[in-house]
């Protein structure tokens, strides 16, 4: 990401994504966001003060630096002595466009500043010396006083972060991941997380601080609101962190309790409404789209690419000459799911598109197969030619098997709902049915993860593959976001500063192999959706090819893969072209780039030793 202002072309996020899969089955944004029926409304924290253990309220100010001779403390405005080449102080003279103490390579060059950038910077390119096209801009090493305890969970040399992980024996998570034979354990995840932190702290400027990480194992399953709320209370009362990463992804209770206690988090629950985030500024950030944003993209795709035309990609030949009749299958995860479905149908109506049959289901292993039979029968009776699916990555297996059993062969329209658009899960669906699947994806076209990915960078840096070999693609985005923003916050680390740095950054560049992210007010979405607390803004067009063989996202070899149209070309809201989809056209389509596209090539470097 690049900051707005004089340095608007300077700052880039680091390698956030090899595979963007929001957060472990983050699930089922299925989930489409919103409150749990039994969740209490959290108390909105209006004050910027911080509660400390003794109950005394303290202002979130920069701590005064104690004087070395034991006398009066020095003012925070007094910068420590430095030598040339200049180590960063907080005062750079002219307006830099950055927060105090922050400087990036291109802006320093514009100002004529001489800075020893160190080995972590490729000074020929002005980017970090890591083998990735998405390497972030070099941040100047900081040599000044960082303010010490600038906010809750922050000291002169540490930032307390709690990372929530599910239990190894969580039956809901086991059900979700068993289909793709994911055998990573919580211990594997923790080892990989700590390895990623070493990597980021070696290359990113942290202003004298390191993350003091606590791994917290959930006390219940990812669907249990009572356990989730208890976990949030424990986070507050026992760990008192600056921020939390992760959370039980099928309930909002964890996030709501954290926010009521003034603790921000990244990917700590299902997506919420824009109103929720506006009422709790700086408290929550997600990496994927919001449910309402995704609805807008899907409606535009259907309205521009599919509506009014014959269902030429249906498996039933008799449907191919008929004008498309749309049905929708969606996951009922909370009361907000109902609102989201209604919003989607209203958006489609703006394109004069009607959903002739809309059916919801509940993700329950005991009832899913029975529900699938009933729902498919309804679709067939309504003469639906094109089924719009918005749900979890397990259910399409049951729906497609049931459709085959009932000799019903429609088009399947995928909508970017989490993990449905991964090859790993799509191989578990009825392949003849799924050979008629196409639509949009939030994911980007993949590059062979042996040559360009979070997996590749981990092995490059550590000299060995990550223990969480399956999960690293969904672990890495959160610390990637955290450290990229941390560089822009500067030495005076506060929750408000974190939000300011993130919101002042320009969108990340779009590429064939990475989505574009933005936060704040960037005019990428209607006013009702901004400020934007979600990350990914664009989509790609995809279709399922049951014939091609290759590796899935977790290196399982097999048959059947998603094809990305035009090499993975991406579109923002309003940019989706009119006209028939390019589904099932081999020309220009790609399953996996065996090497980065020529436009995304990068130099090779030797890794630095861990800091």
Regions found by a protein language model. Give the residues of each.
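Extracellular/periplasmic ligand-binding modules, especially the Venus flytrap/periplasmic-binding
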Residues: 392-398, 443-508
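Solvent-exposed, acidic/polar segments of extracytosolic/periplasmic ligand-binding ectodomains
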Residues: 84-148, 152, 507-611
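N-terminal export and membrane-targeting signals
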Residues: 2-21
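N-terminal extracellular/periplasmic Venus flytrap/periplasmic-binding protein-like
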Residues: 81-231
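Extracellular mucin-like PTS domains
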Residues: 42-85
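Beta-alpha junction/loop-to-helix N-cap segments that form part of ligand/metal-binding clefts
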Residues: 147, 188-194, 202-280, 361-369, ...
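C-terminal region of N-terminal signal peptides and the immediate post-cleavage residues
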Residues: 25-47
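Extracytoplasmic ligand/sensor domains, especially the bilobed periplasmic-binding protein
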Residues: 91, 112, 116, 122-124, ...
């Amino acid at each position: 990401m690049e900051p707005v202002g004089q340095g608007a072309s300077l700052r880039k996020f680091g390698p956030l994504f090899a595979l963007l899969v929001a957060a472990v089955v983050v699930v089922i944004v299925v989930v489409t966001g919103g409150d749990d029926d039994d969740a209490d409304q959290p108390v909105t924290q209006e004050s910027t003060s911080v509660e400390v253990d003794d109950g005394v309220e303290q202002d979130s100010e920069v701590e005064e630096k104690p004087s070395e001779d034991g006398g009066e403390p020095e003012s925070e405005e007094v910068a420590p002595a430095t030598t040339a080449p200049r180590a960063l102080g907080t005062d750079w003279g002219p307006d830099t466009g950055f927060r105090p103490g922050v400087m990036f390579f291109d802006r320093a060059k514009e100002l004529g500043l001489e800075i020893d950038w160190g080995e972590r910077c490729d000074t020929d390119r002005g980017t970090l010396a890591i083998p990735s096209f998405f390497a972030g801009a070099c941040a100047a090493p900081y040599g000044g006083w960082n303010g010490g305890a600038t906010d809750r969970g922050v000291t002169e040399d540490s930032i307390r972060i709690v990372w929530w992980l599910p239990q190894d024996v969580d039956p809901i998570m086991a059900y979700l991941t068993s289909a793709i034979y994911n055998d990573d354990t919580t211990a594997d995840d923790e080892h990989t997380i700590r390895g990623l932190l070493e990597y980021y702290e070696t290359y990113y400027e942290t202003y004298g601080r390191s993350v003091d990480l606590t791994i917290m194992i959930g006390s219940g399953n990812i669907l249990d609101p009572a356990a989730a709320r208890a976990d949030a209370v424990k986070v507050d009362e026992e760990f008192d962190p600056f921020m939390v990463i992760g959370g039980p992804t099928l309930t909002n209770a964890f996030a709501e309790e954290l926010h009521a206690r003034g603790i921000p988090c990244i990917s700590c629950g299902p997506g919420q409404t824009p109103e929720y985030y506006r009422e709790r500024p700086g408290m929550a950030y997600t990496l994927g789209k919001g449910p309402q944003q995704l609805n807008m993209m899907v409606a535009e795709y259907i309205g521009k690419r599919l509506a009014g035309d014959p269902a030429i990609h249906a498996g039933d030949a008799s449907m191919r000459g008929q004008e498309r009749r749309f049905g929708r299958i969606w996951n009922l995860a909370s009361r907000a799911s109902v609102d989201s479905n209604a919003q989607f149908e209203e958006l489609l109506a703006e394109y004069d598109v009607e959903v002739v049959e809309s059916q919801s289901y509940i993700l329950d292993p005991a009832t899913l197969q029975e529900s699938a039979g009933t729902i498919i029968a309804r679709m067939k009776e309504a003469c639906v030619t094109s089924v719009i699916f918005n749900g979890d990555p397990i259910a399409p297996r049951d729906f497609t098997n049931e459709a085959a059993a009932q000799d019903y062969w429609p088009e399947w329209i995928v909508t970017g709902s989490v993990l449905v658009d991964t090859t790993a899960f799509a191989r578990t669906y009825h392949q003849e049915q799924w050979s008629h699947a196409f639509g949009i994806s939030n994911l980007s076209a993949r590059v062979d993860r042996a040559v360009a990915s979070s997996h590749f960078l981990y092995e490059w840096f550590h000299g060995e593959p990550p223990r969480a070999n399956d999960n690293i693609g969904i672990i890495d985005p959160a610390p990637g976001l955290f450290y990229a923003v941390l560089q822009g916050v500067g030495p005076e680390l506060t929750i408000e500063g974190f939000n300011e740095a993130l919101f002042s950054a320009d969108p990340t560049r779009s590429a064939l192999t990475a989505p574009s992210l933005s936060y704040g007010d960037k005019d990428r979405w209607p006013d009702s959706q901004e400020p934007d607390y979600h990350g990914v803004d664009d989509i790609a067009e995809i279709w399922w090819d049951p014939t091609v063989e290759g590796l899935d996202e977790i290196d399982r070899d097999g048959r059947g893969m998603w094809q990305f149209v035009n090499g993975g070309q991406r579109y923002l809201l309003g940019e989706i072209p009119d006209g028939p989809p390019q589904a099932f056209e081999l020309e220009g389509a790609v399953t996996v780039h065996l090497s980065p596209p020529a436009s995304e090539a990068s130099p090779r470097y030797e890794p630095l030793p861990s800091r």
